[in-house]
Protein backbone atom coordinates (compact mmCIF):
# COMPACT_ATOMS: atom_id res chain seq x y z
CA UNK A 1 0.00 0.00 0.00
CA UNK A 2 2.98 2.35 -0.38
CA UNK A 3 1.23 3.74 -3.45
CA UNK A 4 -1.49 5.11 -1.18
CA UNK A 5 1.01 6.71 1.18
CA UNK A 6 2.09 8.93 -1.73
CA UNK A 7 -1.41 9.21 -3.19
CA UNK A 8 -3.08 10.31 0.07
CA UNK A 9 -3.08 14.07 -0.55
CA UNK A 10 -4.66 13.76 -4.00
CA UNK A 11 -7.01 10.96 -2.98
CA UNK A 12 -8.59 13.08 -0.28
CA UNK A 13 -9.30 15.99 -2.60
CA UNK A 14 -10.40 14.00 -5.63
CA UNK A 15 -12.48 11.39 -3.86
CA UNK A 16 -14.50 13.91 -1.90
CA UNK A 17 -15.21 15.93 -5.04
CA UNK A 18 -16.32 12.84 -6.93
CA UNK A 19 -17.95 10.75 -4.22
CA UNK A 20 -19.01 13.03 -1.36
CA UNK A 21 -22.68 12.52 -2.22
CA UNK A 22 -22.25 8.75 -2.40
CA UNK A 23 -20.53 8.74 0.99
CA UNK A 24 -23.39 10.64 2.62
CA UNK A 25 -25.98 8.33 1.09
CA UNK A 26 -24.13 5.22 2.23
CA UNK A 27 -23.86 6.53 5.79
CA UNK A 28 -27.57 7.43 5.77
CA UNK A 29 -28.35 3.80 4.95
CA UNK A 30 -26.52 2.64 8.09
CA UNK A 31 -29.32 4.18 10.21
CA UNK A 32 -26.84 5.03 12.95
CA UNK A 33 -28.11 5.98 16.39
CA UNK A 34 -26.36 7.99 19.12
CA UNK A 35 -24.19 5.71 21.23
CA UNK A 36 -23.55 3.20 18.45
CA UNK A 37 -20.16 1.73 17.57
CA UNK A 38 -19.35 1.84 13.85
CA UNK A 39 -16.47 0.30 11.90
CA UNK A 40 -14.95 2.09 8.88
CA UNK A 41 -12.80 -0.19 6.66
CA UNK A 42 -10.73 1.02 4.92
CA UNK A 43 -10.94 4.51 6.32
CA UNK A 44 -8.36 6.00 3.92
CA UNK A 45 -7.84 9.64 4.83
CA UNK A 46 -10.76 9.50 7.24
CA UNK A 47 -13.24 11.27 4.98
CA UNK A 48 -16.13 9.30 6.50
CA UNK A 49 -15.09 9.90 10.10
CA UNK A 50 -16.72 13.35 10.60
CA UNK A 51 -20.04 12.08 9.26
CA UNK A 52 -19.90 8.87 11.29
CA UNK A 53 -18.90 10.75 14.44
CA UNK A 54 -21.77 13.21 13.98
CA UNK A 55 -24.26 10.32 13.86
CA UNK A 56 -23.02 8.30 16.84
CA UNK A 57 -22.27 11.38 18.94
CA UNK A 58 -19.99 11.75 21.94
CA UNK A 59 -21.43 8.60 23.54
CA UNK A 60 -20.69 6.43 20.50
CA UNK A 61 -17.49 5.14 18.98
CA UNK A 62 -15.86 5.12 15.55
CA UNK A 63 -13.24 2.47 14.80
CA UNK A 64 -11.36 3.36 11.60
CA UNK A 65 -8.94 0.87 10.04
CA UNK A 66 -6.43 1.28 7.22
CA UNK A 67 -3.18 -0.34 6.09
CA UNK A 68 -1.56 2.83 4.73
CA UNK A 69 0.38 4.97 7.24
CA UNK A 70 0.12 7.94 4.88
CA UNK A 71 -3.65 7.70 4.71
CA UNK A 72 -3.97 7.24 8.47
CA UNK A 73 -1.77 10.28 9.11
CA UNK A 74 -4.31 12.46 7.33
CA UNK A 75 -7.16 10.76 9.18
CA UNK A 76 -5.38 11.33 12.48
CA UNK A 77 -4.99 15.04 11.78
CA UNK A 78 -8.77 15.33 11.39
CA UNK A 79 -9.38 13.54 14.68
CA UNK A 80 -6.80 15.56 16.61
CA UNK A 81 -7.98 18.87 15.18
CA UNK A 82 -11.59 18.09 16.11
CA UNK A 83 -10.61 16.87 19.58
CA UNK A 84 -12.53 13.60 19.31
CA UNK A 85 -11.59 11.08 21.99
CA UNK A 86 -14.02 8.40 20.81
CA UNK A 87 -12.42 7.75 17.42
CA UNK A 88 -9.91 4.90 17.32
CA UNK A 89 -7.49 4.68 14.39
CA UNK A 90 -6.04 1.24 13.72
CA UNK A 91 -3.19 0.55 11.28
CA UNK A 92 -3.73 -3.03 10.16
CA UNK A 93 -4.15 -5.44 7.29
CA UNK A 94 -7.92 -5.79 6.94
CA UNK A 95 -7.48 -9.51 6.28
CA UNK A 96 -6.51 -9.82 9.95
CA UNK A 97 -9.47 -7.96 11.42
CA UNK A 98 -10.61 -9.39 14.73
CA UNK A 99 -12.31 -8.29 17.92
CA UNK A 100 -8.95 -8.15 19.68
CA UNK A 101 -7.36 -6.11 16.90
CA UNK A 102 -10.05 -3.41 16.83
CA UNK A 103 -10.57 -3.50 20.59
CA UNK A 104 -14.31 -4.11 20.58
CA UNK A 105 -16.51 -7.14 21.21
CA UNK A 106 -18.60 -6.28 18.19
CA UNK A 107 -19.93 -3.27 16.28
CA UNK A 108 -23.40 -1.98 15.53
CA UNK A 109 -22.62 -1.02 11.94
CA UNK A 110 -19.85 -1.06 9.36
CA UNK A 111 -19.05 0.72 6.12
CA UNK A 112 -16.71 -0.28 3.29
CA UNK A 113 -16.33 2.82 1.14
CA UNK A 114 -14.28 2.61 -2.07
CA UNK A 115 -12.06 -0.09 -0.64
CA UNK A 116 -13.14 -3.56 -1.72
CA UNK A 117 -12.09 -2.89 -5.31
CA UNK A 118 -8.57 -2.16 -4.04
CA UNK A 119 -7.69 -4.54 -1.21
CA UNK A 120 -6.27 -8.02 -1.86
CA UNK A 121 -8.51 -10.97 -0.93
CA UNK A 122 -11.50 -8.65 -0.87
CA UNK A 123 -14.03 -11.39 -0.12
CA UNK A 124 -12.05 -12.38 2.95
CA UNK A 125 -11.86 -8.75 4.04
CA UNK A 126 -15.60 -8.30 3.65
CA UNK A 127 -16.29 -11.45 5.65
CA UNK A 128 -14.05 -10.22 8.46
CA UNK A 129 -16.01 -6.97 8.55
CA UNK A 130 -19.37 -8.77 8.37
CA UNK A 131 -18.42 -11.11 11.21
CA UNK A 132 -17.62 -8.17 13.50
CA UNK A 133 -21.12 -6.71 13.11
CA UNK A 134 -23.61 -7.76 15.75
CA UNK A 135 -26.88 -9.43 14.64
CA UNK A 136 -29.32 -6.70 13.68
CA UNK A 137 -26.49 -4.34 12.73
CA UNK A 138 -26.22 -2.58 9.40
CA UNK A 139 -23.49 -2.88 6.76
CA UNK A 140 -23.03 -0.59 3.76
CA UNK A 141 -20.77 -1.13 0.75
CA UNK A 142 -20.13 1.69 -1.71
CA UNK A 143 -17.91 1.19 -4.73
CA UNK A 144 -17.67 1.53 -8.48
CA UNK A 145 -18.53 -1.12 -11.02
CA UNK A 146 -16.93 -0.44 -14.39
CA UNK A 147 -17.11 -3.53 -16.58
CA UNK A 148 -14.98 -2.03 -19.34
CA UNK A 149 -17.55 -2.66 -22.07
CA UNK A 150 -19.67 0.47 -21.84
CA UNK A 151 -17.61 2.59 -19.50
CA UNK A 152 -15.37 5.50 -20.39
CA UNK A 153 -11.78 4.58 -21.18
CA UNK A 154 -10.67 7.58 -19.12
CA UNK A 155 -12.56 6.32 -16.06
CA UNK A 156 -11.18 2.81 -16.42
CA UNK A 157 -7.62 4.09 -16.79
CA UNK A 158 -7.94 6.41 -13.79
CA UNK A 159 -9.15 3.72 -11.42
CA UNK A 160 -6.80 1.03 -12.68
CA UNK A 161 -3.59 3.09 -12.74
CA UNK A 162 -4.07 5.88 -10.22
CA UNK A 163 -6.37 4.24 -7.67
CA UNK A 164 -5.02 0.76 -8.46
CA UNK A 165 -8.57 -0.55 -8.28
CA UNK A 166 -10.20 -3.48 -10.02
CA UNK A 167 -13.64 -2.04 -10.66
CA UNK A 168 -14.85 -5.21 -12.34
CA UNK A 169 -15.27 -6.82 -8.94
CA UNK A 170 -18.89 -7.33 -7.92
CA UNK A 171 -18.13 -6.31 -4.37
CA UNK A 172 -21.74 -5.98 -3.22
CA UNK A 173 -22.55 -9.65 -3.82
CA UNK A 174 -21.30 -11.12 -0.50
CA UNK A 175 -23.43 -8.60 1.38
CA UNK A 176 -26.48 -9.29 -0.77
CA UNK A 177 -26.03 -13.02 -0.19
CA UNK A 178 -25.91 -12.76 3.60
CA UNK A 179 -27.96 -9.74 4.66
CA UNK A 180 -31.66 -8.97 4.79
CA UNK A 181 -33.58 -5.71 4.40
CA UNK A 182 -31.38 -4.80 1.43
CA UNK A 183 -31.34 -1.32 -0.06
CA UNK A 184 -29.55 -0.44 -3.29
CA UNK A 185 -28.80 2.99 -4.74
CA UNK A 186 -27.19 3.26 -8.19
CA UNK A 187 -25.73 6.33 -9.86
CA UNK A 188 -24.57 6.38 -13.47
CA UNK A 189 -20.80 6.75 -13.55
CA UNK A 190 -19.18 7.29 -16.95
CA UNK A 191 -21.32 4.49 -18.31
CA UNK A 192 -20.65 2.33 -15.26
CA UNK A 193 -22.29 2.36 -11.85
CA UNK A 194 -21.48 3.95 -8.52
CA UNK A 195 -23.36 1.45 -6.38
CA UNK A 196 -24.35 1.59 -2.74
CA UNK A 197 -25.77 -1.55 -1.15
CA UNK A 198 -26.78 -1.74 2.51
CA UNK A 199 -28.34 -4.51 4.53
CA UNK A 200 -29.02 -5.84 8.00
CA UNK A 201 -27.13 -8.78 9.48
CA UNK A 202 -29.59 -11.53 10.48
Model-identified regions with their sequence ranges:
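C-terminal lobe and adjacent flexible extensions of AdoMet/dcAdoMet transferase-like proteins
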Residues: 197-202
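A short glycine-rich, Lys/Arg-flanked "PGG" loop and its adjoining helix->strand segment in the class I
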Residues: 123-135
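Conserved class I S-adenosyl-L-methionine
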Residues: 1-31, 47-51, 74, 150-159
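Class I SAM-dependent methyltransferase SAM/SAH-binding core
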Residues: 39-41, 45-96
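C-terminal alpha-helical "lid/dimerization" subdomain adjacent to the S-adenosyl-L-methionine
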Residues: 14-15, 140-195
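Helix-to-beta-strand junctions that scaffold the AdoMet/dcAdoMet cofactor pocket
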Residues: 57, 119-120, 133-134
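A short acidic, Gly/Pro-enriched loop at the edge of an enzyme's catalytic core
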Residues: 95-110
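A short SAM/SAH-binding and catalytic strip from SAM-dependent methyltransferases
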Residues: 108-121
Amino acid sequence: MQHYDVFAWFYEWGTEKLHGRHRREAIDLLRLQPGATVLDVPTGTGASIPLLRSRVGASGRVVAVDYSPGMLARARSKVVQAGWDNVDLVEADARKLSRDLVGVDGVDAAICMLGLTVVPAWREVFQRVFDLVRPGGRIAVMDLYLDGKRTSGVANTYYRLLAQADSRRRVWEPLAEQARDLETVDHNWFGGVARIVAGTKP
